Amino acid sequence: MLSFETTTPGGPLAAVESEIPQPQGSEVIVKMLACGVCHSDIHMHDGVFDLGHQKQLEVGRPGMVLGHEIFGEVVAVGPESEGAAIGDRRVVYPWIGCGECASCLRGDENLCTPGRALGIAAKGGFAEYVSVPHSRYLFDKGDVSDSLAATYACSGLTA
């Protein structure tokens, strides 16, 4: 599969060929149909968040596959996967937690500090395929366009 990975802060993304992920356990493989570019993708690419008052937070690293505003089609499901079928077209909720910390255990994965957020801690949507840990992170887009649905994965589902 083709993905686009970060190289150096502010540098060009590198086109990288790799194997298409194969689902394990409850994982779901989604083929990208649309992926938004969020302002945080720009920060991760540039390697720094401007915190204001001349303060910055260094972020990002070489080899990241950015993109957390994901919309795609389910193309494979793991043997333990339930709730997703091949051919389903879904928005992917990217704020995936570790599953073990206090935030995750009370159902607040979006507040998980270690986290496994797609496009940040795990490979994201700037690729042909993305591995989603469980079908619970997939949502129907309703009647909006594919490209608009992708942008809902960040601000729309967390609002």
PLM-predicted stretches and their roles:
Residues 21-35, 50-102, 142-144:
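Glycine-rich beta-strand-centered segment in the early N-terminal region that forms part
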Residues 14, 24, 86, 125-126, ...:
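A generic structural signal for well-ordered coil/turn residues at beta-strand boundaries
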Residues 3-22, 39-76, 112-121:
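N-terminal glycine-rich cofactor-binding segment
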